Design a protein with these regions (language model features):
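Active-site pocket scaffolds in enzymes
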Residues: 250-318
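Short amphipathic C-terminal alpha-helix that caps PH/PH-like domains
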Residues: 122-132
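Hydrophobic, well-ordered secondary-structure elements that form the walls
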Residues: 204, 242, 293
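Metal-assisted phosphate- and nucleotidyl-transfer catalytic regions
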Residues: 131-235, 258-284
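Polybasic, low-complexity association/targeting segments
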Residues: 1-2, 6, 18-22, 224-250
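Active-site-proximal helix-loop elements at catalytic-domain edges
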Residues: 45-48, 231-268
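Short, glycine-/Ser/Thr-/acidic-enriched flexible segments
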Residues: 72-74, 92-94, 113-116, 209-211, ...
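Class II aminoacyl-tRNA synthetase-like tRNA-binding/catalytic domains
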Residues: 1-120, 172-177, 193
Length: 318
């Protein structure tokens, strides 16, 4: 049995340089680094994310918690209280995710900017990527609807039957039944995502409302209600995911409750809702926030073929 890491010394040194550059970038901008708990009593209600369950003892009594899938919930409690820009670099966990771009445990950079619009945050992201890449970087902006144009379909106007026909025409034989967003996710991941950001880093904007999660909603240029969020793609890899942050506790609770109803229909575990976050939500200042995969950023910068080379020891070898 080999004890050696999956990452070479040179790759580890490159990773260390990226982490140093990120911290220096935020120090220069006056953004405060914070640390929040990895273990939480509440879980992620998102139906596409599996939380890692943790069993422990609290004051001598057995308890069940979850390793966080993102520091978002706890960071927003700090944001609501302190009302200052904050960032965090930490390990996060998502169960049942393993592949060339996935590891169950990975490193996330997350930051929140009070009184920043999504455009402001996109510009700061561009500056950070330029620093990490050590060269000026420009972004291309592409709407979610326009990303489907090469397939000859419109995600908001066309029917599920049109989506199904498109999938079959491209030899994708999976049945998402009557799940409209499921069909769109299938087509996007198989036929659109692999080519995004191949020539220039691409911001995909105006996602369907069904993908809003913790983002606000607005009407796009065609009048469709969409999520105020964007994702950054480089070389066909999703690098970052940003929201114009929802600051409405009642709406957030309704979304979490709806998620759990979907989880029940799908036979997934019902997740405890983070009531601390709900209580803090109304006090969050107008802001935008973003999560960035550090391991994936290292992959695209150093042209690594697998996330294995961006992480010293992967979960299956830990």
């Amino acid at each position: 049995m080999s004890y050696k890491p999956t990452q070479t010394l040179a790759q580890a040194q490159s990773r260390a340089a990226i982490l140093f550059a990120i911290r220096q970038f935020f120090a220069d901008k006056g953004v405060m680094e914070v640390t929040t708990p990895i273990l939480s009593n509440a879980g992620n209600t998102d139906t596409f994310i599996e939380s890692v369950v943790a069993h422990f003892h609290q004051l001598g009594k057995p308890a069940t918690g979850y390793l966080h899938t993102s520091p978002e919930f706890a960071m927003k409690r700090l944001l609501a209280t302190w009302q200052v820009p904050i960032y965090q670099i930490c390990q996060v966990f998502r169960d049942n995710e393993r592949g060339t771009k996935h590891n169950i445990e990975f490193t996330m950079l997350e930051w929140y900017r009070p009184h920043f619009s999504l455009d402001d945050l996109a510009e700061e992201l561009r500056q950070l990527i330029s620093v990490v890449m050590d060269k000026p970087i420009a972004f291309r902006k592409l709407s979610y609807a326009d990303s489907f144009s090469p397939l000859g379909i419109h995600p908001y106007r066309d029917s599920i039957e049109a989506f199904k026909a498109c999938a079959i025409a491209h030899d994708i034989h999976l049945d998402m039944t009557d799940d409209r967003q499921g069909w769109l996710d299938l087509l996007f991941s198989h036929l659109i995502e692999p080519d995004l950001g191949k020539d220039v880093p691409t911001l995909v904007v105006d996602y369907p409302l069904a993908t809003a999660a913790l983002a606000k909603a607005e009407h796009d240029a065609e009048g469709h209600l969409v999520a105020k969020r964007f994702e950054l793609y480089i070389d066909g890899i999703e690098i970052a995911n940003a929201y114009d942050e929802l600051a409405d506790g009642d709406e957030l609770y309704a979304r979490f409750t709806s998620d759990n109803a979907q989880r029940q229909q799908l036979g997934l575990p019902i997740m405890p809702i983070d009531k601390h976050l709900i209580a803090a939500c109304d006090e969050i200042p107008p802001c935008s926030g973003i999560a960035l995969g550090v391991d994936r950023l290292l992959m695209v910068r150093d042209r690594l073929p697998s996330i294995n080379h961006a992480i010293a020891i992967t979960t299956d070898k830990a």
